[in-house]
Structure formats: structure tokens, C-alpha cells
Amino acid sequence: MHPDLLPHLRCPVCGQPLHQADAAPPRALRCPAGHSFDIARQGYVNLLTGRAPHVGDTAEMIAAREEFLAAGHYDPFSAALATAAARAVPRRVRPGDGVGEPVAYPDLVVDAGAGTGRHLAAVLDAVPTAVGLALDVSKPALRRAARAHPRAGAAVCDTWGRLPLADATVAVLVNVFAPRNGPEFRRVLRPDGALLVVTPTAEHLVELVDRLGLLRVDPAKDARVADSLTRHFEPAGQSTHRHRLQLTRKEVLTLVGMGPSAWHTDPARLTARVAALSEPVTVTAAVRLARYRPI
């Protein structure tokens, strides 16, 4: 766990600060009340209390996602998110530099529902003054996220519940194709912080939906996202990003296997349908990046 993350973390049981247990290397985080949370050998800390009510992505889904993202297919989305995050972080310097606003250093970027941490890593590359925390309920995802970037850490938690973070401590919170917890996002964001939400548009993977029997994007998704956040945030702008992918049949299988359709598609039927596609398979990738300010 990166030491600069510790001031931001809180015990999920009692809410007190966490510190690394005395060991070399540290194998647990503890609070003054004695609650202890193991650090896995892969580097992530388990801050989940009890059993999560939501099932995280499986090891197979995470392996597919890592393979697909590593090929660069969604890099334009990561780049757009990184640019937005860099613009959202106020210019902050160490006390005594004479420029900007001297505050505690560095800033914290949190990815809620981080998956493998690839998008968080892109943001940290664009914001060199920040450290990052990947939150997810999937341990297979966090095994990768914990090593996604030298300035990143990772923690298992249920993002539908109380986040293991101090009040008003996050500079930028990013949320990519993941559940949104408006009250908690507002609690942990600084008053000058920013929430960046990436969701698929109706065009996303449209060429595959009918041919492969995939889940459709809800036409009312944008309205539902806005409604879920309206009590705690005000819109600060949005942009749409789309590009065309040229995929092999194997890459199409990987793409389907990494997302929610993997839970709802019969593998044998999917394989047969993909085998009937002509290569290269042209697929539209399209997302909306919405920016919000706390109110």
C-alpha cells in the first residue's frame, strides 16, 4: 500500500484512521481500536466487512478485460478521462513554492469500480502530483489494479456501502462502467473536487447486439445516471467519444467475455455466432463522459 494513501483511508468498522502494522514488509492495516485488515501478497488490502451483497467480476472476466484493454482498443476513452481529470485537479504546490494554493500533498484520485486499474493508471500518468486508489469488490481485478501504477494502491470494498475513506479527501473520483453511489461519492469528495462518470451510449457495440444476443444499453441510462446523482452533484459538462474498432473473431469473444453480457450469454451459442462473422469485425465503441461538481 502506497504510504501517501494512508492519511485518506478509514477503518470500515469504526471509521478511525488506518496505519500499517509494524512488519517488514507490512502485511496488514490497523486502526487504534485494533481492527486489522490483511494486505494480500499481490498488494491490495481487504477492507470488506462481511459478505458483499453484489458479485464481482470473475477471474475469467478480468483476464478477458486485461487482454482486450492491453491491446489498446479503449485507449481513446482512457485518454479522454485522463485529460478531464488533469483539468479537474486544481493547481496545487508544496508550501513555500510561491505559486498556486499550498495544501496537503499529493492529491487523491479514486476509481470506484476500478477493475484492472488501467483507466486509473492513465489518469495518474496525466496527473503526476496525485496518488490513486482502486476500489472494487473483485479480488481478481484488484490483483492487477494493485500493480497498475507505481502511485496506485487497491482495496476490496463494496462501493454500494460506506467507502473506507475520510470525508472530503478525494480530489477526483472516476467511475467507468460501474455502479454509482451518489451519497458516498459526495461525502468523500472535496468541496472543489470533481466526479467523472463514463457510461456507454446506445451506439456502443451496436453492431454486435442483435447478431450475438448481447445486452442493450438502456435508452434511459443517461437520465437514470443524472437522477441518481442530482441530490448531491450538479452537472459540469459532458462529451461523447466514439471510434471504430477492427476486431478479429477472437477479440470479439474476448470483448463479450469481459463485460456484463458474459453473465447472460450461452458460451456455445456465442462461439457459434461469432464464428459466422467475417473478419475484420467492425464495431463501434462509444461512451459519454459526464463531469459533476459537488453541491
Curated annotation (Swiss-Prot):
InterPro entries the record matches: Methyltransf_25, RlmA_N, rRNA_m1G-MeTrfase_A_prd, SAM-dependent_MTases_sf
Keyword Flavoprotein assigned: no
A molecular-function term among this protein's GO annotations: metal ion binding
Residues where S-adenosyl-L-methionine binds: Y74, T116, G117, H204
Transmembrane segments: none
Database matches in SUPFAM superfamilies: S-adenosyl-L-methionine-dependent methyltransferases
Residues engaged in binding Zn(2+): C11, C14, C31, H35
Enzyme type, top EC level: transferase
Tagged with keyword rRNA-binding: no
EC assignment: 2.1.1.-
Single biological process term from Gene Ontology: response to antibiotic
Keywords tagged on the record: Antibiotic resistance, Metal-binding, Methyltransferase, S-adenosyl-L-methionine, Transferase, Zinc
Highest taxon of source: Bacteria
Disulfides per UniProt: none
Protein family: Belongs to the methyltransferase superfamily. RlmA family.
Biological role stated in the UniProt entry: Confers strong resistance to mycinamicin (MM) and tylosin (TY). May function as methyltransferase.
Entry protein name: Putative 23S rRNA (guanine-N(1)-)-methyltransferase
Native source species: Micromonospora griseorubida
Upper taxonomic lineage: Bacteria, Bacillati, Actinomycetota, Actinomycetes, Micromonosporales
Gene symbol of the encoding locus: myrA
